[in-house]
Design a protein with these regions (language model features):
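Hydrophobic transmembrane alpha-helices
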Residues: 2-72, 77
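A compact, surface-exposed functional segment
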Residues: 67-74, 80-94
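Membrane-embedded alpha-helical hairpins and interfacial helices in multi-pass inner-membrane proteins
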Residues: 31-41, 75-80, 100-231
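Hydrophobic core segments of transmembrane alpha-helices in multi-pass, intramembrane catalytic enzymes
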Residues: 42-46, 85-90, 184
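Hydrophobic alpha-helical transmembrane segments
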Residues: 13-20, 59-63, 80-84, 114-122, ...
Length: 233
């Protein structure tokens, strides 16, 4: 009992640490995209990776990203609102990729790209709606006019055609979010798969038995937590 509790605590702490690292990587990638004038957000790729490890890791990654945004950019109200978009990513990744019924499907290579593509489209739709609502609220209450340049250009293109601001803010986000979330989902899951493979090979070399490809050491060394243990939500 005490040994199991110690393993769970160790796994929890390592998931928290990995989530913080993911937050730093997200902010670094986002700043690089701004510096290189890439018309994407590029701030959630490692949130996807972290979410593949577990709920704890994904949520900590989301919190870390927006906390670091306050440090880097100063206090901006949108960091509080768009934090919910990051949480949406965590929820969607866990529910669409790691529920028990989805787990078996993901083990078949042929369906994996399709499931990832569906996840990217769902994320683009939901987060575009969330982002549009937040943008509309911010611009109505605070005259907020900061954001992704490509999105802003599309918003004002729609507005000049007499499309209502809320609809404009939502529609303008979808094409950018679709590309951004597809990159985040495929890139983030790809990094997770590589790390999973490395840990599985290490276990096999140590003579450990890995029961299935998703029975992954979520702490990368401590606190074994199978992916399907998170299904009870």
């Amino acid at each position: 009992m005490m040994k199991n509790n110690a393993l769970k605590l160790r796994g929890f702490l390592i998931q928290c640490a990995a989530g913080i690292v993911a937050g730093f990587l997200n902010i670094a990638l986002s700043l690089a995209a701004i510096k290189l004038h890439v018309p994407l957000f590029m701030d959630t790729l490692f949130t996807v990776t972290a979410s593949c490890f577990g709920w704890t890791c994904g949520i900590v990654a989301a919190v870390s990203l927006h906390t670091l945004s306050f440090v880097v950019h100063g206090f901006m109200l949108q960091n509080l609102t768009f934090f919910f978009c990051s949480l949406t990513m965590v929820v969607c990744v866990r529910l669409m990729l790691f529920r028990k019924n989805a787990l078996n499907t993901m083990e078949h290579g042929g369906s994996k790209p399709l499931r990832l593509l569906i996840l990217a489209i769902v994320l683009a739709l939901v987060i575009s709606l969330e982002g549009g609502l937040f943008y509309y609220a911010l611009i109505s209450l605070t005259k907020y006019n900061i954001g992704n340049q490509a999105v802003n250009m599309l918003i004002y293109t729609f507005v000049t055609q007499n499309v209502p601001m809320l609809i404009s803010a939502t529609l303008a986000r979808f094409p950018v979010n679709l590309v951004d979330k597809a990159a985040a989902v495929f890139g983030g899951y790809g990094i997770f798969a590589l790390l999973q493979k490395a840990v599985t090979q290490r276990k096999n070399s140590d003579g450990s038995k890995v029961e299935n490809s998703f029975a992954f050491d979520s702490g990368m060394g401590g606190g074994i937590e199978n992916a399907d243990e998170y299904d009870e939500i």
